[in-house]
Regions:
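Conserved Rossmann-like nucleotide-cofactor binding loop
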Residues: 128-129
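Peripheral, non-AAA+ core regions of ATP-driven protein-machinery
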Residues: 2-13, 17-81, 88-96, 101-108, ...
Length: 456
């Protein structure tokens, strides 16, 4: 007879189980991800049984009706934008982020807004006491009696409370503190996180309850726990930002009910998180005047144009291997663009240290900011000042050509709205933009023409 409790090794990345430790996971091919956990085979076999569905009946696809009422507005337009228009009933939403970034504050504000709409909301905390939550809530504002708090880590107890009170919205803070009694391993382990999420998914789908799950991230910036966790939930949101800065960016990386390209911008204040309605104006605040190596570029996140400042500092290196750093964008992309400048216009950069930064702490990897990076590098290297009313966008290829990008007209419209007077853009995008905006449009076909544009 097999032992009820045995030890097994689980991959922390994908949840693969092995009877012995392995250096590389055969499922996800990651290295050094196996940890040993105690597994109760009897409990797992009992918990894994599925009750027979006596009333299960297939429904024709044409008979299923959908309506806008299935989405619940959070009264936070920035969050609704990322969610795809609001919270879908019966959805399971995972919110990840670094400790102290503001995940709990964001969801507490969501609870405040939803309970104010006479929706029953249950906030379950496994990290803070009721008194600690009350102190944080007083800083945010007044709350409705439709919001109930529960300090509990036992998933069985939480399930009993949900089945008894039948709330419409549930917040679990956090999934790493939840404990399923049918799993013998410690809270936060691979088995616990996977099984607990599975139970919450059954509750959300079976009772048509929208559930928000808070998840901590690892040092690599991904949600702690097995990768299967992100596959189980309907929506994955990452709350990004620097704890030493006031801005916060909510980014959707998975959404079964909407786009994954949208972002929401917030500002952390003493009264909580405040939405930033115009991120472009916010990102450009504090931009220095008459400084070389600084240029404004336009990027698109989903359907929203965002103007941002790209800074570059090129200086002589006193080391055999020049230092190159990139903050807010892809490091390899910066190296590629510097190689293009050396090859296509003969700009000597091999003996220079290069520092590229996207001001404001926002991270952008869209190819449309290539031209902005190139102009910032050329401006710093040649000590040229680019007029503060000039904006640019465009993708740069390996031949030095400036390629067209999507939604060029929306980018120019956003720049015109903020008072920019000159726009350097791909020449192929000029016909799509037209002459409807009171801006000087300079079309460039390659990086040589882009250099001429900032020198004149």
């Amino acid at each position: 007879m097999a032992k009820a409790k045995t030890s097994a090794f689980f991959c922390q990345n994908c949840g693969y189980e092995s009877s012995k430790w392995m250096g590389q996971c055969p499922a996800c091919r990651e290295w050094n991800t196996f940890v040993e956990e105690l597994v109760d085979r009897k409990a797992l076999s009992t918990s894994g049984k599925i009750k027979p569905a006596t009333e299960a009946k297939p429904v024709p696809l044409s008979a299923i009706k959908t309506s806008d009422e299935e989405r619940i507005s959070t009264s936070m337009p920035e969050l609704d934008r990322v969610l795809g228009g609001g919270v879908v009933k019966g959805s399971l939403v995972l919110v990840g982020g670094d400790p102290g970034i503001g995940k709990s504050t964001l969801l507490l504000q969501v609870c405040r807004n939803l309970s104010g709409q006479n929706l029953s909301v249950l906030y379950v905390s496994g990290e803070e006491s009721l008194q600690q939550i009350k102190l944080r809530a007083e800083r945010i504002g007044t709350f409705s009696d439709h919001l109930e708090l529960l300090c509990e880590t036992s998933l069985d107890t939480i399930r009993t409370v949900i089945e008894r009170n039948k709330p419409q919205i549930v917040v679990i803070d956090s999934i790493q503190t939840m404990y399923n009694e049918n799993v013998s391993s410690a809270p936060g382990s691979v088995s616990q996180v996977r099984e607990s999420t599975g139970v919450l998914m059954q509750i959300a789908k079976g009772m048509d309850i929208s559930i928000f799950i808070v998840g901590h991230v690892t040092k690599e910036g991904v949600v702690a726990g097995p990768r299967v966790l992100e596959h189980m939930v309907d929506t994955v949101l990452y709350f990004e930002g620097d704890r030493h800065e006031s801005y916060r960016i909510l980014r959707g990386v998975k959404n079964r009910f909407g786009s994954t390209n949208e972002i929401g911008v917030f500002e952390m204040r003493t009264e909580g998180l405040v939405e930033v309605e115009n991120p472009s104006e916010y990102m450009l605040s504090g931009k220095p005047k008459d400084a070389s190596g600084s240029v404004v570029a336009c990027s698109i996140e989903g359907t929203r144009p965002i103007l941002l400042e790209i800074q570059a500092l090129i200086c002589h290196s006193y080391f055999n291997n020049p230092r190159r750093t990139a903050t807010g964008t892809d490091f390899n992309r910066v190296n590629l663009l510097m190689a293009v400048l050396e090859k296509r216009i003969g700009m000597q950069l091999t003996d220079c240290d290069a520092y590229v930064n996207i001001a404001g702490g926002i991270r952008m990897n869209e190819p449309a900011i290539d031209l902005g990076i190139v102009l910032a590098i050329m401006s710093s290297k040649l000590d040229l000042t680019i007029d503060e009313k000039t904006i640019c966008f465009g993708e740069v290829g390996l031949s030095g050509e400036v390629r067209g990008v999507s939604m060029a007209e929306q980018r120019v419209a956003e720049a015109a709205k903020l008072g920019f007077e000159v726009c350097i853009l791909p020449k192929v995008s000029l016909p799509s933009v037209g002459k409807k905006y009171a801006m000087k449009l300079i079309g460039v076909a390659n990086v040589r023409e882009a250099l001429d544009a900032i020198q004149t």
